[in-house]
Amino acid sequence: MTYATWIKDRPVAHRGYHDMNHHVWENTLSAFSRAAEAGFAIECDVQLAADSVPVVFHDHDLERLCGIKGDIREKTSAELGMLSVGGTKDKVPTLKQMLALVAGKVPLVIEIKGREGDGEDDGFAEAVLEVLEGYQGKVALMSFDYHILRDLKNAGSPYPLGLTAMGDKPEEFFEHDEAMQLGLDFISYHYPHLPNTFITAQRASGIPVITWTVRDANGREHTYKYADQMTFEGFDPREASSPSL
């Protein structure tokens, strides 16, 4: 296990501190800059481009964010770097560009977006670790996907590894327990599914738990009752109430 208690220290801005009212879109350099300036940790999503370069983007398809249909894995990082996100000046950034911008100012919680299917993610874990090599700053890696977490472990990841998960049924807890047998360091859980026996047991064993995705003060209060820290969007968690941004 890797020491990961720092993940509890501050709220985590979901896909950066984005704000549609000010045309700051998710997973963009503008959103990451805004989060760093506010002192929030940053959550981001990483996909693998056609040239095996990790890029920061949530969806498998480009249409919602870039206005064109197509699988992100069919575009090179250079091609993606020319695509406007939400019609703004921001383009789809590489993980390397994002790291250069944040430069250790705040912690990073990076979710790796795997794919189903044999061989779909071959080399993905190694590509992420290669980009991270030498980065001076706090980093944690997480995924919904067992095979991604296994590959990160097998590749000798020096970073805390976490399970992204949801669910409130025993069969789901069984799958989560199986993933935790990899020796994971933290959990990111869907907060409406708390409390539950799986998370209660993991916290009792010393595993830090953050939640996703909190959008108001009620969710914040629920998180701090049943978990350790939150991943948030759409409000300023420092405020007593939770007005829209």
Predicted stretch roles:
Residues 1-245:
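Phosphate-group recognition and catalysis centered on beta-loop-alpha active-site segments
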